[in-house]
Amino acid sequence: MFDAGDRGGGGGVVAVKRMKLCEEEEEEEEGMEVDEEEEEVGWVWRPPGGLAGEDEAAAWEGRAAAIVVSDAVEVDFPVIYVNAAFEAATGYRADEVLGRNCRFLQFRDPRAQRRHPLVDPMVVSEIRRCLNEGIEFQGELLNFRKDGAPLYNRLRLIPMHGDDGFVTHVIGIQLFSEANIDLSNVSYPVYKQQSNHRPNIQEINPASHEHIPKIQSSEYCCILQLSDEVLAHNILSRLSPRDVASIGSVCTRMHELTKNDHLRKMVCQNAWGRDVTVRLEMSTKMLGWGRLARELTTLEAASWRKFTVGGRVEPSRCNFSACAVGNRLVLFGGEGVNMQPMDDTFVLNLESAKPEWRRVKVSASPPGRWGHTLSWLNGSWLVVFGGCGQQGLLNDVFVLDLDAKQPTWREVASEGPPLPRSWHSSCTLDGSKLVVSGGCTESGVLLSDTFLLDLTKEKPAWKEIPTSWSPPSRLGHTLSVFGKTKLFMFGGLAKSGSLRLRSCDAYTMDAGEDSPQWRQLATTGFPSIGPPPRLDHVAVSLPCGRIIIFGGSIAGLHSPSQLFLLDPAEEKPTWRILNVPGQPPKFAWGHSTCVVGGTRVLVLGGHTGEEWILNELHELCLASRPDEDE
């Protein structure tokens, strides 16, 4: 829960919004329409994940939303306002509710001491987590009227911030509907958190233990006496997805707990990070967290497919750079005819019924370039760095908000920039910090430095990450993020004495440490099982922290489409080969490959001679597509 300390300063803002709520309620009762300005305040209900179709939309249309306001400054979020729709839906009068926490709706009887066993503890835990973090919650929860009748509550909790940035109030928007459920059908017993009764195994699951002699209570596993909420929120959610799946086979109760999708989401969120799970939720939609965690862990559903898209990227080009923004692919720049640097931007919306390339009309563009990097930042922002322009190599930084009404490339004035370069590698940390590594200078010298630029600063300044040792200078390598703050470098054309050779070495650095250091990974595996030396290849960072390597420029007869998997966090990292069915691309290059939503790897086209075919895409699907089950 939020700290109940002194957080004054925001009450006036929320008080005005509470008055707006009251005014809107009175207008509704009098049959008056609310104008557009008042509708934009944000009190319109939108179900989690959107409505499934017109029938469902019609079912909810016109239903009055129950509104509750709680004080986040006081202990336990006491209710300070309810509207008439709440009173009508729940049977509780306002004077019976004000000053209490809204959890009483989880009790079937007003005199009950704890919530009903059919109330999903994982949803309750998710609500608590969102309140603790001051973020919005959307979900469905079983509630009860004052007379004990069950209701489904489609709930949306919106935190309101004061002028000082602290959460001062929480708005609850609720849509209640009748729940036709058997309240006596409890799939597993839920014990009180404080209980002197120690049940034996027969009492836990009598049907499956009819012929087993009674076991003394002293031999009963104490952990099973914990409440479902404690087991889910404090223990199971902190384990890895693989461990949770294993625990689900222990007994019936654990099976029921671990198959819950809210728990699975908490497990994935704690293991992979909130930003990753948000992207996965947007891209995989109704796949389910249990199935998604299994498929991303085992890669059992991985497959290649080929498809075509419309539109054209003209003039034709090579050596461009591409990245993904949500479910959109963005392409910038490239090398045209007679080594002409290009400065245009194209986008491909994969959510469209018929995806096609279209040129983005921008009011200003960076100087044309090729051999640069294009990286995704938070939201709909992109960042371009370096490359080879009309007048030589560059070290400038430009950002673009793809969702702006008038998209404009804006140059970021930054202090202490690194040397101008091309064929370097870059990635982003926390969606806001640009990391640049290596590359080649104007004179052809290979670089081994690593720079960081925090784009959230009012005056961004480049900072070289000082290390006591650096990997050999190189270009055409990859730089990936795993474990939130850790960097993984692989391959490239590296300096080896007086020679420049393709590399298959791997290095890691934890940028979150006080003194980050590069460390070479001592990888293991059967002879010849690791990826052959290469440059300009593809490195895919999976949500679970593992890395997939394929493609690039490889010496000899090795196949660029062969996939190699490595977990750099293992005590002894070991390369493994992935055999994936489907139609892989003949060639794949790092600058023209994008990762969409954490589960889709898009390789842009092939090429005939010098001409790239950007209407042909190969997709490596790391998880099942929801439409495959239809």
From Swiss-Prot:
GO biological-process terms attached to the record: circadian rhythm; negative regulation of cellulose biosynthetic process; positive regulation of flower development; protein ubiquitination; regulation of DNA-templated transcription; response to blue light
Stretches assigned to the F-box domain: 220-268
Kelch repeats: 380-430, 432-483, 485-537, 545-597, 599-629
Record's keyword annotation contains Repeat: yes
Subcellular location: Nucleus
Pathway(s) it belongs to: Protein modification; protein ubiquitination
Keywords: Biological rhythms, Chromophore, Flavoprotein, FMN, Kelch repeat, Nucleus, Photoreceptor protein, Receptor, Repeat, Sensory transduction, Ubl conjugation pathway
InterPro entries attached to this UniProt entry: F-box-like_dom_sf, F-box_dom, Gal_Oxase/kelch_b-propeller, Kelch-typ_b-propeller, Kelch_2, PAS, PAS-like_dom_sf
Free-text description of this protein's post-translational modifications in UniProt: FMN binds covalently to cysteine after exposure to blue light and is reversed in the dark.
Pfam family, one: Kelch_KLHDC2_KLHL20_DRC7
Cellular component annotations (GO), alphabetically ordered: cytosol; nucleus; SCF ubiquitin ligase complex
Domain PAS: 54-126
Origin superkingdom: Eukaryota
Keyword rRNA-binding on entry: no
Function: Component of an E3 ubiquitin ligase complex that plays a central role in blue light-dependent circadian cycles. Acts as a blue light photoreceptor, due to the presence of FMN, that mediates light-regulated protein degradation of critical clock components by targeting them to the proteasome complex. The SCF(ADO3) E3 ubiquitin ligase complex is involved in the regulation of circadian clock-dependent processes including transition to flowering time, hypocotyl elongation, cotyledons and leaf movement rhythms.
Note: 'Adagio' means slowly in Italian.
Record-linked NCBIfam families: sensory_box
Similarity section: Belongs to the ADAGIO family.
Protein name as catalogued: Adagio-like protein 3
